[in-house]
């Protein structure tokens, strides 16, 4: 019996990490399904990604971009806007994992909302861990959710937040070439 598909929401889908996530999901379509995507201003790219992924929920945080995109949304897509829209996506009932790849502090409230809803959180925004690492980890523990660091820098911060000594755990770190 094959495991069920992981349903993923990508907050920051038009950035490099978001685009890479969509590519991986397409390559592993038997195991990963993108169900929601969000961006700040890239309305045309977001609409293209909706068509590519088949995601049925989307958000643009920039009001002007959201207004432009609202008339071009594919049929049946639930369309949200603003920070509240990010929170709506992060707490979609059907989501298993929420990837936060939003730059800066804008991802904090959606990250905490996802964890409070019991969603596993993949963190590609180190600001969230630096700013509110203890709150993130406590919220995850309270709701039996996992926090998954996406790259080496976040993994190092995550290990510090876990409070484990280096001899207690061995961790594989993925290094990216720039």
Write out the residue ranges for each language-model feature.
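Redox-cofactor binding/interface segments in oxidoreductases and associated redox assembly factors
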Residues: 60, 99-101, 123
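Conserved small/polar residues in nucleotide/adenosyl-binding loops
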Residues: 173-178
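Short glycine/serine/threonine-rich phosphate/pyrophosphate-binding segments
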Residues: 16-21, 45, 105-111, 123-124, ...
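Short acidic-hydrophobic, aromatic-tinged amphipathic segments that line or gate anion-handling sites
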Residues: 60, 78-83
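Residue-level signal for inorganic ion chemistry
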Residues: 14, 50, 98, 118, ...
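Rossmann-fold NAD(P)-binding glycine/threonine-rich loop
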Residues: 126-144
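N-terminal Rossmann-like dinucleotide-binding module
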Residues: 2-58
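Beta-loop-alpha module in the N-terminal Rossmann-like domain of NAD(P)-dependent dehydrogenases
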Residues: 81-113
């Amino acid at each position: 019996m094959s495991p069920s598909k992981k349903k993923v929401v990508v907050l920051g889908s038009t950035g490099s990490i978001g685009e890479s996530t969509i590519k991986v999901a397409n390559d592993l379509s038997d195991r990963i399904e993108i169900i929601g995507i969000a961006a700040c201003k890239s309305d045309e790219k977001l609409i293209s990604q909706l068509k590519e992924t088949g995601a049925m929920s989307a958000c643009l945080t920039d009001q002007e971009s959201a207004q432009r995109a609202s008339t071009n949304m594919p049929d049946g897509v639930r369309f949200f806007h603003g920070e509240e829209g990010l929170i709506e996506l992060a707490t979609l009932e059907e989501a298993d994992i929420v990837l936060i790849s939003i730059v800066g502090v804008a991802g904090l409230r959606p990250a905490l909302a996802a964890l409070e809803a019991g969603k596993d959180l993949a963190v590609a925004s180190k600001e969230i861990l630096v700013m509110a690492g203890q709150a993130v980890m406590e919220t995850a523990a309270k709701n039996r959710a996992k926090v998954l660091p996406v790259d080496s820098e976040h993994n190092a911060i995550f290990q510090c937040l876990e409070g484990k000594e280096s001899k207690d755990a061995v961790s594989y770190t993925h290094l990216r070439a720039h």
